[in-house]
C-alpha cells in the first residue's frame, strides 16, 4: 500500500500530516509535512520537484493550429492520489468526532428539557393535593 510514496523514501506514510503543491516555472513542487513529535517546534517536511509534462494539442476544431501545454506529471498524480487518501481519511475522522460531539450536545439538551418537563408535571401533582 502507498507504493508511490514508498518509492519516494517515505517509510511511514501514516506519519504524514498534510501536503502542499505549487507550480514554479516548468516544475511542480510537492512538499509533504509530517506530524510533529512532542517537544518539536517545527514539523519535519520533505520537498520533491517534478518537471511538468509538455503536450502538443490541436488549438482549434479546424485542425489548423497546434499549441503546447504543460500538465502535471503522471507520477506526481499517483503520489497526490495516495496523499489525498491519507489526508482525507484524517478529515473523515475529525468530522466523525465533531458529529459525535454535536449529537452528544443535542442529546444533553433533549434530556435536560425532558427533566424540566417531568419536574414541572411533578410540581403540578404536588400542588393539586
UniProtKB/Swiss-Prot annotation:
Lineage: Bacteria, Pseudomonadati, Pseudomonadota, Gammaproteobacteria, Enterobacterales
Family: Belongs to the UPF0325 family.
Protein name as annotated: UPF0325 protein PC1_0937
Matches recorded under NCBIfam families: PRK13677.1 (NF010213)
Cited InterPro entries: UPF0325
Signal peptide: none
Coiled coil: none
Amino acid at each position: 500500500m502507498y507504493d508511490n510514496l514508498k518509492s519516494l523514501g517515505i517509510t511511514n506514510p501514516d506519519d504524514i500530516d498534510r501536503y502542499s503543491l505549487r507550480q514554479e516555472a516548468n516544475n511542480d513542487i510537492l512538499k509533504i509535512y509530517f506530524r510533529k513529535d512532542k517537544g518539536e517546534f517545527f514539523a519535519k517536511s520533505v520537498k520533491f520537484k517534478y518537471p511538468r509534462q509538455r503536450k502538443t494539442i490541436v488549438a482549434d476544431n479546424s485542425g489548423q493550429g497546434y499549441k503546447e501545454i504543460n500538465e502535471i506529471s503522471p507520477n506526481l498524480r499517483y503520489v497526490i492520489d495516495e496523499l489525498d487518501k491519507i489526508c482525507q481519511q484524517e478529515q473523515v475522522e475529525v468530522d466523525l468526532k465533531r458529529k459525535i460531539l454535536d449529537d452528544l450536545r443535542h442529546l444533553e439538551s433533549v434530556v435536560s428539557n425532558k427533566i424540566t418537563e417531568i419536574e414541572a408535571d411533578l410540581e403540578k401533582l404536588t400542588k393539586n393535593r
